[in-house]
Amino acid sequence: MKDCSNGCSAECTGEGGSKEVVGTFKAKDLIVTPATILKEKPDPNNLVFGTVFTDHMLTVEWSSEFGWEKPHIKPLQNLSLHPGSSALHYAVELFEGLKAFRGVDNKIRLFQPNLNMDRMYRSAVRATLPVFDKEELLECIQQLVKLDQEWVPYSTSASLYIRPTFIGTEPSLGVKKPTKALLFVLLSPVGPYFSSGTFNPVSLWANPKYVRAWKGGTGDCKMGGNYGSSLFAQCEAVDNGCQQVLWLYGEDHQITEVGTMNLFLYWINEDGEEELATPPLDGIILPGVTRRCILDLAHQWGEFKVSERYLTMDDLTTALEGNRVREMFGSGTACVVCPVSDILYKGETIHIPTMENGPKLASRILSKLTDIQYGREESDWTIVLS
């Protein structure tokens, strides 16, 4: 019995073949097959999020018998999967999302990619998918971006979205850890996440009959099942005239996340302190990369209290009655920072005075982050592709 490095033990004897079991793939073994026909690049001003893809993709196959195969950059193509693949039946899969930016100096930067690799690794363990060397995967991703670098928009309002994905591919209807898997990476040039544009406020629909995640579940992992199961509530939010779902949890209606974003409240708290608050990472909150950066920035500024704490709808409505709420905004890789203007809760529309207050803090955070992403400000939060 041998530990296959995927969070539990499994038979990994290599019977039936003489190949050595490979514990991780290596970027130095990368096989590159360039596309012979390159597609026309889109206008960066007319990009619809996630609908256009670049010329190439990265794939790495794994099996419990032989371990990792060599990584391969190849022309973008459809996958060939057995219809019994575990990802198709039992959602044995995960994904990540990060971006490459073309800076004002024409250099291409990745923003905090190590945090994405860390989160992807944790999600793989939770999904019983094989683990990998995070630095090797990141190097392979960098090589993919370099090959498709002309797809990184020449624009400071667009970027190249990077979508690593990891799926179980074993052809079996048994509910079990897969013995075969495929890791692949897609690239997509993107503009603003919301059709309303960058930094326009969104309205939220809060209904406690739906929950996004629960204690002991997978809400802190970036798994497709967390998103697919949210679509019904999202459709209901739209039917009620709102753009996103404000996910509540528990009998006290704790505020957790907004759609695909983490949530921040900038207010005067119960003790009369100026505070930036966001829900804690207790297992039901996705540990967002942008969330982490916002907390780090706020701590560096040292101008107000910064807290990871529980917030309820009663806390919010009481604060609004006392004119103690300044701003509410979501954060995420796709949107960066997104102001909140209204919440539909218990049949009533609650107005959040985010835009009336500037929003000074949300605007400041957005400006700081985008300055770093587009190279207007040097920072160790980015990796410059050489």
Curated annotation (Swiss-Prot):
Catalysed transformations (reactions): L-leucine + 2-oxoglutarate = 4-methyl-2-oxopentanoate + L-glutamate; L-isoleucine + 2-oxoglutarate = (S)-3-methyl-2-oxopentanoate + L-glutamate; L-valine + 2-oxoglutarate = 3-methyl-2-oxobutanoate + L-glutamate
Organs and tissues of expression: During embryogenesis, expressed in the brain and kidney. Overexpressed in MYC-induced tumors such as Burkitt's lymphoma.
Compartment annotation: Cytoplasm
Alphabetized InterPro entries for the sequence: Aminotrans_IV, Aminotrans_IV_CS, Aminotransferase-like, B_amino_transII, BCAT-like_C, BCAT-like_N, BCAT_family
Family: Belongs to the class-IV pyridoxal-phosphate-dependent aminotransferase family.
Keyword Chaperone included in the entry's annotation: no
Cofactor(s) essential for the protein: pyridoxal 5'-phosphate
One Pfam assignment: Aminotran_4
N6-(pyridoxal phosphate)lysine PTM positions: 222
Family annotation (NCBIfam families): ilvE_II (TIGR01123), PRK13357.1 (NF009897)
Protein task: Catalyzes the first reaction in the catabolism of the essential branched chain amino acids leucine, isoleucine, and valine.
CDD domains: BCAT_beta_family
One example of a Gene Ontology biological process annotation: G1/S transition of mitotic cell cycle
Organism of this sequence: Homo sapiens
GO cellular component labels: cytoplasm; cytosol; mitochondrion
Keywords, ordered alphabetically: Acetylation, Amino-acid biosynthesis, Aminotransferase, Branched-chain amino acid biosynthesis, Cytoplasm, Lipid metabolism, Pyridoxal phosphate, Transferase
Molecular-function GO terms, alphabetical: branched-chain-amino-acid transaminase activity; L-isoleucine-2-oxoglutarate transaminase activity; L-leucine-2-oxoglutarate transaminase activity; L-valine-2-oxoglutarate transaminase activity
The protein's assembly and partners: Homodimer.
Protein name: Branched-chain-amino-acid aminotransferase, cytosolic
N-acetylmethionine modified-residue sites: 1
EC nos: 2.6.1.42
Means of activity regulation: The branched-chain-amino-acid aminotransferase, activity is inhibited by anticonvulsant drug gabapentin.
